[in-house]
Amino acid sequence: MLILSRKVNEGIVIDDNIHIKVISIDRGSVRLGFEAPESTLILRAELKEAIVSENQKASASVDESLLENIKKVIKP
């Protein structure tokens, strides 16, 4: 992991097209601004983890009887 120190209004550039700027530092909280192409997905880590968790729950809760009914309808 690369660790950098930045002050307010200083920034970091990633891959020439992603710019991160320190907007403010207040009471243990840092506000960051991001400039990136619209195709770049930027998420807070906890939101990404929640999405992954929900996707895993959704894929694990397949009703086996429903699958059997689908197999009966779709015969090779």
Swiss-Prot record:
Give the record's GO biological process terms: bacterial-type flagellum organization; mRNA catabolic process; negative regulation of translational initiation; regulation of bacterial-type flagellum assembly; regulation of carbohydrate metabolic process
Main subcellular location: cytoplasm
Q: Which InterPro entries match?
A: CsrA, CsrA_sf
Q: Where in the cell is it found?
A: Cytoplasm
Please list the coiled coil stretches: none
Annotated Gene3D superfamilies: Translational regulator CsrA
The molecular function GO annotations come to: mRNA 5'-UTR binding
Could you tell me which Pfam families the record lists for this protein?
Answer: CsrA (PF02599)
Entry GO terms, CC: cytosol
Give a yes or no for keyword Metal-binding in this entry.
no
For the keyword Repressor, the answer is yes
Entry keywords, A to Z: Bacterial flagellum biogenesis, Cytoplasm, Repressor, RNA-binding, Translation regulation
Q: Which domain of life is it from?
A: Bacteria
Report the family membership.
Belongs to the CsrA/RsmA family.
Q: What does this protein do?
A: A translational regulator that binds mRNA to regulate translation initiation and/or mRNA stability. Usually binds in the 5'-UTR at or near the Shine-Dalgarno sequence preventing ribosome-binding, thus repressing translation. Its main target seems to be the major flagellin gene, while its function is anatagonized by FliW.
Q: How does it assemble?
A: Homodimer; the beta-strands of each monomer intercalate to form a hydrophobic core, while the alpha-helices form wings that extend away from the core.
Protein name in UniProt: Translational regulator CsrA
Species this protein is from: Helicobacter pylori (strain Shi470)
